[in-house]
Amino acid sequence: NSLEKNPDLRDLRNETLVGVLDGKILVHNHCYRADEMATMINISDEFGYKVSTFHHGVEAYKIADLLADEGICAALWADWWGFKHEAYDMSIANIAIVDQARGGKGCAIVHSDDASGIQRLNQEAAKALAAGRKAGFDISEGRAMTWITKNPAKSLGILEQTGTLEEGKDADIVIWSGNPFSIYSKAEQVYIDGALAFDKASNFMPHTDFDLGVKEWEDK
């Protein structure tokens, strides 16, 4: 064993496992089905580590109370499912059900690993909000906003740094032309760490992908 011969040699695999067991590394699991997620929770309980978030979680609504009890977030699609066997049994109110579990103690996140969906994550949240209200849940727009702000920060373990508008946190802010959940609203300004990173009114910034292409062509 190389570690026995050289105890100063780092074992990156076990070092990572130690970080997980010590709670310094947050575990994110990719699961679709409820039984898969429940099994992973049982395994985490057996070996003494914490699952931070389940990703995709098409059947998360089936174990929403369990997720809330365990303090586990679920990063979910608003309305995408059925593309393979384990993704068939979806509820359009999945995000809302997870959010409202145990009297609103759930941690739901609107997720998208699609290039178009992530560009319009606010609209994905709007669809999830509409589905939840249609299902009978009384969910405010402010609550729905946490699905793409506060809860992702909590999931990543950086809530003390970002995720909400509070004094002392990173000033990562988007100024919208209207209601962020409206398809007609556009990002007017974007601030990152308090510095203006995008200004729609500025003539120095391209406004569309077409403008970007034209600029690249002109620079050649």
Where are each of the predicted segments found?
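Polyanionic/metal-chelating signatures
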Residues: 1-53, 186, 192, 217-218
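Acidic, glycine-rich loop-and-beta core segments that form the ion-binding/anion-interacting portion
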Residues: 41-48, 58-61, 69
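C-terminal cap of metal-dependent C-N hydrolases
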Residues: 154, 166-210
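Surface-exposed acidic, glycine/proline-enriched linker/cap segments
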Residues: 208-220
